């Protein structure tokens, strides 16, 4: 009970979307979408990976997306008259490149054969450790990916639509800058 708020973020190549959620009743209190500020360094993931491999490039990419996240948090909390200290949780999902850049993990291997990311699983940490400006004790969780081209954004879609629990064959399509699809049911899935 009491004031208990959280955020859900979709870190996309083109846009960053955030939702403010009342964690007590699960109501969505607001949504904001902004163009991903990393776009000034390249409009696609390959260009951004190359830029990130340059001196201070990874830091600049990280700062750009953190600016997006913190501005959206500030905007939504201000609109609802919610103190940042009342935000206790943030969950982020994105394609594998976006998650690497958000967490300052070297993304170089994503674009080089055999195309294996540095990691597909990201540690849950306190939000300030990631540069996210909410309650200092708030938890920041990052959805895992499966492989280079099946990131946490697709994993979250599979969870949200219940694809992994259904008997019927279903198709999930993520239409964005980098399109992905998953076909399957509770028995099997294939993604591309």
Residue ranges of predicted features:
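N-terminal glycine/serine-rich phosphate-binding loop of ATP-dependent small-molecule kinases
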Residues: 1-101, 109-111, 141
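Conserved mixed alpha/beta core segments that line enzyme active sites in large multi-domain catalysts
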Residues: 4-6, 140-174
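Glycine-rich phosphate-binding loop of actin/hexokinase-like ATP-binding domains
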Residues: 12-13, 18, 26-44, 109-124, ...
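Glycine-rich phosphate-binding loop and adjoining helix at the ATP-binding site
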Residues: 44, 87, 101-156
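Noncatalytic linker/hinge segments flanking ATPase motor cores
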Residues: 58-62, 73, 128-138, 190
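Alpha-helical multipass membrane-protein architecture
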Residues: 63-67, 148, 177
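Short, well-ordered alpha-helical packing segments
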Residues: 70-77, 91-93, 155-159, 179-182, ...
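Short, glycine- and charge-enriched coil/turn segments that flank and shape catalytic ligand pockets
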Residues: 78-83, 133, 164-167
């Amino acid at each position: 009970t009491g004031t208990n708020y959280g955020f859900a973020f979709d870190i996309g190549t083109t846009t960053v979307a955030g939702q403010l959620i009342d964690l007590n009743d699960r109501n969505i209190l607001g949504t904001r979408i902004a163009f991903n500020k990393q776009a000034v360094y390249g409009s696609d993931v390959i260009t951004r990976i190359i830029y990130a491999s340059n001196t201070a490039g990874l830091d600049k990419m990280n700062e750009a997306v953190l600016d997006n996240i913190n501005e959206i948090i500030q905007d939504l909390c201000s609109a609802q008259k919610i103190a940042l200290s009342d935000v206790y949780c943030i969950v982020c999902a994105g394609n594998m490149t976006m998650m690497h850049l958000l967490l300052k993990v070297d993304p170089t291997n994503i674009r080089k054969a055999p195309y294996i990311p540095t990691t597909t699983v990201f540690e849950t940490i306190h939000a300030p450790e990631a540069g996210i400006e909410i309650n200092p004790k708030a938890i920041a969780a990052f959805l895992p990916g499966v492989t280079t081209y099946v990131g946490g954004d697709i994993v979250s879609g599979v969870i949200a639509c219940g694809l992994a629990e259904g008997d019927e064959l279903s198709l999930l399509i993520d239409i964005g800058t980098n399109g992905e699809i998953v076909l399957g049911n509770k028995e099997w899935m294939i993604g591309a």
